[in-house]
Amino acid sequence: MAVQTFPNEIVFFDLETNVPNKAGQHFHILEFGAIIVCPKKLEELESFTTLIQPKDLSVVSIRSSRSDGITRAKVTNAPSFEDVAEKIHGLLNGRIWAGHNIRRFDCVRIKEAFAEIGKAAPEPSGIIDSLGLLSDKFGKRAGNMKMASLAAYFGLGVQKHRSLDDVRMNLEVLKHCATVLFLESTLPNHLEGKWHTSSKIMTRSRRNYQIAQRAMPYSKGSLEKMTQNVKNLLSKAQGNQTLQSLINHSHSLLR
C-alpha cells in the first residue's frame, strides 16, 4: 500500500522535552503538538497533541516552575512514543514541516525517537524554520528572535511552552511578520525601516511580561486589525492565491 503524502500542506509542530543536566543524559520527548495548515488561507485544518511518557521517568521534574508545565505526574500515565508513533508519522510524513528552530532541534529529536523504536522516520516535502527565516528577513526588531520575544513584539501574549499553544503562536507570528514585509515591499518609501522598535533591547533574562512593555511602533492591537484587513484585501483580489505566491510578494519570505 502506497504511503499517502500531502506535499502542499503545512504542518506546524513543536516538541517539549526534558533538559539534560547530567553527563550522558539524552533528550526525551515529553509532549508533541501539531496543526495542519491550509496553504491558501493559512487556516488550521486539523490539530493533535499528546503527552508522552519517557522510558526513564526520573528525567522529568517532579515540579514545574510554570503553572501549566509538564511534571512527572502528568506523564506517568501518558502513552509511550511507540504508542503514538504511527499517528505522528501520519501527520508529518510528506508534508511541509514548519516550526521555530526545528532544523537544529525538533527535526533531530523526531529522527532520534523513531530510530530508538526501530521504525523509519517521517520525511518532509520541505522545511520552514521560522527562526532562521525571520532572523534573515525580519532582522532583530524583536530582540533575540525567540518565540516569546516575537510574540511579545506583536502583542500576542506570553508563550506557554506547551506544544499545541506554541505552534498556534508560531503561525500567528509568521502571519504578522509576512504582513509587515508585504506592506514594506509594496510601499518601501513610506514604511521600510520605519517600523523598527527603539535600539534599547531588553536582556534575555528579563521575563516575558517585561519584554511586552517594550515600546511598540503601533498601538496595541492595531497590527492585528491591519493583518486581517490585508488578508481580506488579498482574498478579494486573488481568491485562489497560495502561500507561496503571497511569500513571493514578500521578498521571497519562504524559500
UniProtKB/Swiss-Prot annotation:
Q: Where is the active site?
A: H161
Q: Annotated Gene Ontology MF terms?
A: exonuclease activity; metal ion binding; nucleic acid binding
Organism domain of life: Eukaryota
Q: Which InterPro entries does the annotation name?
A: Exonuclease_RNaseT/DNA_pol3, RNaseH-like_sf, RNaseH_sf
* Summary of the knockout phenotype: Shorter root phenotype and impaired phloem function.
User: So which cofactors does this thing need?
Assistant: Mg(2+)
| EC number(s) reported in the record | 3.1.11.-
- Which SMART domains has this protein been placed in? EXOIII
Name this protein carries in UniProt:
Protein NEN4
* CC terms in the record's Gene Ontology section: nucleus
Cite the PANTHER family for this sequence.
DNA POLYMERASE III SUBUNIT EPSILON (PTHR30231), PROTEIN NEN4 (PTHR30231:SF26)
Q: Which residues bind Mg(2+) 2?
A: D14
Zinc found in the keyword field: no
**Looking at its record, which EC class is this enzyme?**
hydrolase
Residues given in the record as Mg(2+) 1 binding sites:
D14, E16, D166
Q: Which UniProt keywords apply?
A: Exonuclease, Hydrolase, Magnesium, Metal-binding, Nuclease, Nucleus
Tell me, in a sentence or two, what this protein's role is.
Probable exonuclease required for enuclation of sieve elements.
Which SUPFAM superfamilies does this entry report, sorted A to Z?
Ribonuclease H-like (SSF53098)
Q: In which tissues is it expressed?
A: Expressed in the sieve elements and phloem pole pericycle cells.
Chief location of this protein? nucleus
According to its UniProt record, where is this protein located? Nucleus
The induction text for this entry reads: Regulated by the transcription factors NAC045 and NAC086.
Describe the location of the Exonuclease domain by residue ranges: 11-174
